C-alpha cells in the first residue's frame, strides 16, 4: 500500500484534453439527434426537464438582477424561498447568465445535459487513472460511470446526472495528497463545493463520503505514525482545513433557505411514508429503463412490477458488473483498495433499498441514516445512492478490463490485448445506449427528445402577478419555462412537493370567474388571469359547485389573444 501511495501516475494536460473531447463526442453520438435540435427538443420527456430549464435560467437572472433575493423566485408567488422548493442547480448559475427567454433556456438545458454526461466520463477516467488504471482501462471506468443503463431514466433529473464533480473532487484530493500539492487539495474541496451547489441529492452523499474517507485516512495515519514512519507536511494540513471550511461554509449557506422552507412548509418534509414509497425491492437492481437498447425489453416484466419506475430502475449493467467482479482480483490496485471498493459497492446497494414502514423492510440500514444523521430527512429517494455504487463498480470495472487484457497479452500478444480493450469499452457503451430498435415507427430511434411546446405569442408582457389556468402539473411545467421571458411573478409553479397554499388557491379559484374567486385573487394582489383555451381542463382540479359570473359584473376586463383568454383584475 505504501508503494502504491508513492506511485501517483503522470497525467499530461494533453491526455486530459483528448479524453474530454472524446467524452463530449461520445455524448453527442449516444444522444443523437438531440444535438441537431438544440433549443427545440429536450431529453427524455416534457416533465422535469422543463422546470429544470427554468431553474438554471432563474439562477442566472437572479444573480444578475437580485443577488440578495436569489431564492425569491417568480414561481408560487407570494411564497418566500420558492427556489429552494427543490434542488436548484445553483452550480450552473454561470450558464444561466448566457441568453434569455424559453429558447435559450432549452438550449442551455440540452447543452448541460450533454456536459453532465461528458464530465461524468472524464471524472471517472481521471480517478481511475490516479488509482493506477492504464488509460484504456480508465476509459472503461469513464464509460461505466457515465453510461450505466440506470442513468437513461434520469434524463429529466439533471441534478442526478450531474455527478462528474464527485470523481473529480476525489481525484484532486487524492492526487494532491500523494504529490503533496496544497493547491490541488483546495481545488478538490472547491469542486466538492460546486457539486454541493448542484443539489443536496448528490452533494449530501459526497459530504458524508469525504467524512468517511477522512476518518479512514486519520486512522491509517495514527496507526502508521505510532512507529514514527509518517510525517505530514504542514501545508497539506492547512490546505485540508481551508478546503474543508470552504465546503462547510458553502453547505451551510445553501442549506439555510431549505431549512426555512421546512419550517414554513411542513408538507415539504420527507416523511417515512414518502421515503418508503420511493424505496424499492431487491429486484429493482435488475430492472433497466424502457429506453435501454439492450435491456429495456428484456427487463420489462420486472420493471412493470415497480411502483416508482424513474426512481427504482437501478440496473448497473451486466458488462459493468462482470468486469467489476473480475476487477476484485486485479493486482494493479492494492488489495485494501479492491476490498474497500467491493465492500463499499455492496453497502451502498443495501442502503439504496431504503426502508419500508412495516415488516422486515423496516429494519433496513437506510433507516439509520434517515433517523440519526443530519440532512438525510431531506432526501426523498434512497436510490440516488446508486450514483456512488456505480462509481465504485466503474473503478473496479477498469481493473477487470485491465486484467482481461493482460491475460490476452500474455497468451496472444499485444494486438489481441488492444482488440480486447476496444471491445470491452464498446460493450459497456452499447449496453448503456438509449437507442431503440423499432421504436415509434423508426427502425433505429435515438434517445427520446420530444419537441418543447412554444409559448402563445399573446402571453408576453401581461401584467404580473398572474395566474395561469388550467394548472395541472404538466401545465405548470410549461408555464415555468415560458416565464423565462421576463420572469413575471405568478401563482403557478412546479416542485417536488405540493405547497398547501397552492392547493388552497386552486380550490378558491375553482369557479373563476365568480365573485369569491375574484375577491380572493384581488386580496392576494393578482392582476391578471390567463386561461389557455388550447389546453385540456385539469382532471384533478377542485370541482366548481356554484358556477361563474359575467366578467363585466365583476369589474373584469376580458380580452382574447389567440388561444388565450385574458382577464385583467384591475
Question: Model segments located where?
Answer:
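Hydrophobic/aromatic-rich transmembrane helices and adjacent perimembrane loops
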Residues: 315-318, 365-404
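Membrane-lumen/periplasm interface segments of specific transmembrane helices
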Residues: 241-274, 279-300
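Membrane-interface coil-to-helix junctions
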Residues: 27-120, 148-163, 276-304, 356-370, ...
Amino acid at each position: 500500500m505504501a508503494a502504491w501511495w508513492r506511485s501517483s501516475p503522470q497525467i499530461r494536460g494533453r491526455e486530459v484534453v483528448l479524453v474530454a473531447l472524446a467524452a463530449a463526442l461520445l455524448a453527442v453520438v449516444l444522444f443523437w439527434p438531440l444535438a441537431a435540435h438544440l433549443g427545440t427538443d429536450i431529453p427524455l420527456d416534457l416533465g422535469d426537464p422543463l422546470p429544470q430549464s427554468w431553474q438554471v435560467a432563474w439562477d442566472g437572472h437572479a444573480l444578475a438582477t437580485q443577488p440578495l433575493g436569489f431564492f425569491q423566485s417568480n414561481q408560487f408567488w407570494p411564497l418566500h424561498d420558492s427556489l429552494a422548493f427543490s434542488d436548484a442547480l445553483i452550480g450552473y448559475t454561470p450558464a444561466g447568465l448566457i441568453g434569455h427567454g424559453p429558447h435559450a433556456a432549452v438550449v442551455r438545458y440540452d447543452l448541460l445535459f450533454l456536459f453532465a454526461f461528458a464530465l461524468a466520463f472524464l471524472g471517472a477516467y481521471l480517478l481511475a487513472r490516479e488509482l493506477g488504471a492504464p488509460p484504456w482501462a480508465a476509459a472503461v471506468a469513464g464509460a461505466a460511470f457515465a453510461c450505466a443503463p440506470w442513468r437513461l431514466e434520469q434524463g429529466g433529473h439533471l441534478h442526478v446526472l450531474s455527478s462528474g464533480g464527485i470523481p473529480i473532487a476525489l481525484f484532486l484530493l487524492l492526487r494532491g495528497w500523494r504529490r503533496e500539492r496544497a493547491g490541488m487539495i483546495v481545488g478538490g474541496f472547491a469542486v466538492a463545493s460546486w457539486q454541493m451547489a448542484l443539489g443536496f441529492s448528490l452533494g449530501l452523499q459526497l459530504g458524508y463520503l469525504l467524512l468517511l474517507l477522512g476518518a479512514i485516512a486519520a486512522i491509517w495515519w495514527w496507526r502508521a505514525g505510532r512507529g514514527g514512519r509518517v510525517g505530514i507536511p504542514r501545508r497539506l494540513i492547512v490546505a485540508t482545513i481551508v478546503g474543508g471550511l470552504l465546503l462547510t461554509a458553502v453547505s451551510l449557506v445553501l442549506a439555510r433557505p431549505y431549512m426555512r422552507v421546512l419550517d414554513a412548509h411542513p408538507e415539504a418534509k420527507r416523511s417515512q411514508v414518502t421515503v418508503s414509497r420511493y424505496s424499492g425491492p431487491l429486484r429493482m437492481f435488475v430492472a433497466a429503463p424502457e429506453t435501454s437498447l439492450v435491456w429495456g425489453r428484456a427487463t420489462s416484466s420486472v420493471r412493470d412490477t415497480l411502483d416508482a419506475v424513474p426512481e427504482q430502475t437501478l440496473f448497473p449493467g451486466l458488462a459493468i458488473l462482470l468486469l467489476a467482479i473480475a476487477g476484485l482480483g486485479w493486482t494493479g490496485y492494492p488489495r485494501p483498495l479492491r476490498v474497500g471498493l467491493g465492500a463499499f459497492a455492496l453497502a451502498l446497494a443495501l442502503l439504496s433499498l431504503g426502508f419500508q414502514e412495516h415488516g422486515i423492510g423496516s429494519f433496513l440500514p437506510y433507516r439509520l441514516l434517515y433517523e440519526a444523521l443530519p440532512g438525510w430527512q431531506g432526501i426523498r429517494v434512497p436510490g440516488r445512492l446508486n450514483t456512488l455504487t456505480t462509481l465504485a463498480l466503474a473503478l473496479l470495472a477498469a481493473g477487470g478490463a485491465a486484467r482481461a487484457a493482460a491475460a490476452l497479452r500474455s497468451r496472444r500478444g499485444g494486438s489481441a490485448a488492444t482488440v480486447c480493450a476496444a471491445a470491452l469499452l464498446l460493450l459497456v457503451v452499447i449496453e448503456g445506449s438509449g437507442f431503440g430498435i423499432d421504436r415509434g415507427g423508426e427502425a433505429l430511434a435515438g434517445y427520446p427528445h420530444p419537441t418543447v411546446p412554444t409559448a402563445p405569442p399573446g402571453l408576453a408582457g401581461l401584467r404580473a402577478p398572474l395566474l395561469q389556468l388550467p394548472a395541472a402539473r404538466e401545465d405548470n411545467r410549461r408555464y415555468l419555462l415560458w416565464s423565462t421571458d421576463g420572469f413575471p411573478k405568478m401563482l403557478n409553479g412546479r416542485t417536488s412537493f405540493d405547497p398547501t397554499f397552492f392547493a388552497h388557491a386552486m380550490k378558491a379559484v375553482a369557479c373563476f370567474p365568480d365573485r369569491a374567486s375574484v375577491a380572493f385573487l384581488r386580496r392576494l394582489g393578482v392582476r391578471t388571469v390567463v386561461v389557455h383555451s388550447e389546453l385540456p381542463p385539469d382532471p384533478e382540479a377542485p370541482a366548481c359547485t356554484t358556477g361563474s359570473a359575467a366578467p363585466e359584473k365583476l369589474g373584469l376586463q376580458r380580452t382574447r389573444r389567440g388561444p388565450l383568454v385574458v382577464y385583467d383584475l384591475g
